[in-house]
Curated annotation (Swiss-Prot):
<dbReference type="Pfam" id="PF02650">
    <property type="entry name" value="HTH_WhiA"/>
</dbReference>
<dbReference type="InterPro" id="IPR027434">
    <property type="entry name" value="Homing_endonucl"/>
</dbReference>
<dbReference type="InterPro" id="IPR003802">
    <property type="entry name" value="Sporulation_regulator_WhiA"/>
</dbReference>
<keyword id="KW-0132">Cell division</keyword>
<dbReference type="GO" id="GO:0043937">
    <property type="term" value="P:regulation of sporulation"/>
</dbReference>
<dbReference type="GO" id="GO:0051301">
    <property type="term" value="P:cell division"/>
</dbReference>
<comment type="function">
    <text>Involved in cell division and chromosome segregation.</text>
</comment>
<dbReference type="InterPro" id="IPR023054">
    <property type="entry name" value="Sporulation_regulator_WhiA_C"/>
</dbReference>
<comment type="similarity">
    <text>Belongs to the WhiA family.</text>
</comment>
<feature type="DNA-binding region" description="H-T-H motif">
    <location>
        <begin position="275"/>
        <end position="308"/>
    </location>
</feature>
<dbReference type="InterPro" id="IPR018478">
    <property type="entry name" value="Sporu_reg_WhiA_N_dom"/>
</dbReference>
<dbReference type="GO" id="GO:0003677">
    <property type="term" value="F:DNA binding"/>
</dbReference>
<dbReference type="InterPro" id="IPR039518">
    <property type="entry name" value="WhiA_LAGLIDADG_dom"/>
</dbReference>
<keyword id="KW-0238">DNA-binding</keyword>
<dbReference type="Pfam" id="PF14527">
    <property type="entry name" value="LAGLIDADG_WhiA"/>
</dbReference>
<keyword id="KW-0131">Cell cycle</keyword>
<protein>
    <recommendedName>
        <fullName>Probable cell division protein WhiA</fullName>
    </recommendedName>
</protein>
Length: 327
């Protein structure tokens, strides 16, 4: 199974005792995966889900909260779709469910984001809303350069509401328009881990963290072995050469190295094959790759000028053929 499937299976088993948290989860599930339509003069709510466990959970919660019958149907695969879908259908008292779940106002007007009760609710309700949104349209990719936790949203208002809920539980999330749909994205690895724990997917977090740590350990050893691309090899040579020059610069300047330049230089020396972007992420506080490059450049320029004044070899003497041949 995929990591996303594992997370949804785990979330579908999360025990929720507070009625307000159940209501927040249901509200998000209906908003992010549901559709309201009039059939034969009656309002009907339909929710399309990719997990039977999630469909049964939604059925149970709605029955408990609103004392109404809920139907669950299996939609067999067809066309380009290889896996079955599960349709949760609310016909009886659908208008009452829509109002109490915060899909519409008391006067029947559509609420495009999340309900005010969820937005201004407790921390546990914000967590429950995120759990519902992820069960409705969430995904998590394996750790890597482009790893991200994403939730597909029905509209911009819903996306902004979800970002607000993330902020309330201490997680930074951003909205983006991708492939014609609104999405909420969490990219920072620590934030992804914290969010998984918050919504109840602790076991999945451990699996994801183990994969991430394994990749971080394996990547430096494999990096040069996989350098079939000439551009990557050139980048590695340039990074190693820069590290050698930085070491020479530190010796030339001694205690006269400005602290902010020394910090950038130490990052370059300690992580010889890392890209400038990676060095920026390792800095505390984090910097852009341009800021890192600028500081290293000023460090080398300052050291080369000092070397000329002292009549000694500058930083370029540290870059030898033997050093580059090792790559």
């Amino acid at each position: 199974m995929s990591l996303t499937t594992d997370i949804k299976d785990e979330l579908a088993r999360v025990s929720v005792t507070r009625q307000s948290a159940k209501a927040a989860e249901v509200s998000a599930l209906l908003r992010f995966a549901g559709e309201m339509q009039a059939i034969a003069g009656r309002l009907v709510i339909e929710v399309n889900l990719d997990s039977m466990a999630v469909a049964r959970r939604l059925q149970e919660f709605i029955s408990q909260l609103y004392d109404t019958d809920v139907q669950v149907h299996t939609v067999t695969p067809g066309g380009a779709r290889k896996n079955p879908k599960y349709l949760v259908r609310i016909v009886h008292n659908a208008d009452e469910v829509a109002r109490r779940a915060g899909l519409v106002t008391r006067s029947g007007h559509l609420i495009r984001g999340l309900s005010p009760q969820v937005i201004s609710g407790t921390i546990s309700e914000a967590e429950a809303a995120w759990r519902g949104a992820f069960l409705a349209g969430g995904s998590l990719t394996d750790p890597g350069r482009s790893s991200a936790l994403e939730v597909v949203c029905p509209c911009q208002e819903a996306a902004l509401a979800l970002v607000g809920c993330a902020r309330r539980i201490g997680v930074t999330a951003k909205t983006k328009d991708s492939r014609g749909s609104e999405r909420v994205v969490v990219r920072d690895a620590e934030a992804i881990g914290a969010l998984l724990t918050r919504i109840g997917a602790q076991k999945s977090r451990i699996v994801w963290e183990e994969k991430r740590l394994s990749r971080e350990v394996r990547t430096p050893a494999n990096r040069l072995a996989n350098f079939d691309d000439a551009n990557l090899r050139r980048s590695a040579r340039a990074a190693v050469a820069a590290a050698a020059r930085v070491e020479r610069a530190m010796k030339i300047l001694g205690d006269d190295v400005p602290e902010h330049l020394a910090e950038a230089g130490q990052l370059r020396v300690q992580h010889r094959q890392a890209s400038l972007e990676e060095l920026g992420r390792l800095a505390d506080p984090q910097m852009t790759k341009d800021a890192v490059a600028g500081r290293i450049r000023r460090l080398l320029t300052t050291a080369d000028k000092r070397a000329r004044d002292l009549g000694i070899p500058d930083t370029t003497v540290a870059v030898t053929e033997e050093l580059l041949d090792e790559l």
